[in-house]
Regions:
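Glycine-rich phosphate/pyrophosphate-binding beta-alpha loops
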Residues: 61-63, 194-195, 250
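Alpha/beta catalytic cores of group-transfer enzymes, especially the acyltransferase/condensing modules
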Residues: 11-13, 41, 102-241, 245-246
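Short, charged, surface-exposed secondary-structure boundary motifs
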Residues: 299-304
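FabD-like malonyl-/acyl-CoA
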Residues: 2-142, 189, 267-297
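Non-catalytic positions within long, well-ordered alpha-helices that form the structural scaffold/packing
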Residues: 261-264
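A short, well-structured juxtamembrane/interface segment
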Residues: 251-259
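Charged catalytic carboxylate motif
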Residues: 27, 68, 171, 206, ...
């Protein structure tokens, strides 16, 4: 059995120029052309050239990171055709990439879902000023106290040492003050709103109608679910339900990685722009190997 786990980047990793060198391969170029056709705008141009402001819009950013991550994965497969994976995971929108790679839904369908998901999340952010704050080194009890005092929520449990909280702008401001009083390091993030919290319920409700018409299949590769930190079931409807919950519930990334390691994962290969996940994974367990495929140079540097 393979000891390799493929992991896929989430929102925030985007940067102009991403995927451009992969697109020198005609097969990857065709992937971007297909995305352009499905979405009805020039996604490739925005990925390759920017502007960065366009790339930060959730309805563009989410399908862009997905397409670039799939391109990186296909380029890897072409170079290492004999390499197999024992499971897949992705951070937030990256979980959709993992489900596509596992055969749960097609490329075109995933693009359409992510464009809508991004648009709905952006609309929810515009309707209510909200934000996120990254908290480092707090205990579970301290995090509970911060959330209670500020009326905010745990959004991303990235490692035992780093948790991102989501809530109203006022709540985030209160949390920042509480952290200062407690002597806990905290950084307010430059994001559009309170992702992975109940404040995203309007987006989740709109996504229900979109997913109703999308056919899901049982995964051909085990995929870890952000909301549970455990593997998705083989029931397509159950996967759909979990992915709807993901919009408003905590991302239990640390639990996902611990489950992957318990399941035999020793080498984590990150696909997509940047190497944020590799850093998070190393914080969870220093003994594992992390590799990232973000451009042709990083792919060429891999020795397996």
């Amino acid at each position: 059995m393979s000891d390799k786990v493929c992991v896929f980047a989430g929102q925030g990793a985007q940067a102009p120029g991403m995927g451009k060198d992969f697109a020198a391969d005609p097969e990857v170029a065709a992937l971007f052309d297909r995305a352009n056709g499905v979405l009805g705008f020039d996604l490739a141009k925005i990925c390759f050239e920017g502007p960065a402001e366009d790339l930060t819009k959730s309805n563009i950013c989410q399908p862009a990171i997905f397409t670039m991550s799939v391109a990186a994965f296909r380029a890897f497969q072409k170079k290492f055709p004999a390499v197999s994976f024992n499971m897949a995971a992705g951070l937030s929108l990256g979980e959709w990439t993992a489900l596509h790679i596992a055969g749960v839904l097609g490329f075109d369908e995933t693009l359409r879902v992510l464009e809508a998901r991004g648009r709905f999340m952006q609309e929810a952010c515009s309707a209510q000023p909200s934000g996120m704050i990254s908290v480092m080194g707090a205990t579970g009890e301290q995090l509970d106290a911060i959330c209670a005092k500020a009326s905010i929520y745990k959004a991303n449990i990235n490692s035992d040492a780093q948790v991102v909280l989501s809530g109203s702008k006022e709540g985030i401001s209160i949390a920042e003050g509480v952290c200062k009083e407690m002597g806990i390091k905290a950084i307010v993030l430059q994001v559009a709103g309170a992702f992975h919290s109940p404040l995203m319920m309007p987006a989740r409700e709109k996504l229900v109608a979109v997913l109703k018409d999308v056919a899901f299949a049982a995964p051909k590769l085990p995929v870890l679910a952000n909301t549970t930190g455990a593997l998705h079931s083989n029931d397509p409807q159950a996967i759909k339900d979990v992915m709807l919950r993901q919009v408003t519930e905590s991302v239990r990334w640390a639990d996902c990685i611990k489950a992957a390691i318990q399941g035999g994962g020793k080498t984590f290969i990150e696909f997509g722009p940047g190497k944020v996940l590799s850093g998070l994974i190393k914080r969870i367990d220093k003994s594992v190997t992390t590799v990232n495929v973000s451009d042709v140079a990083s792919l060429d540097a891999i020795v397996l």
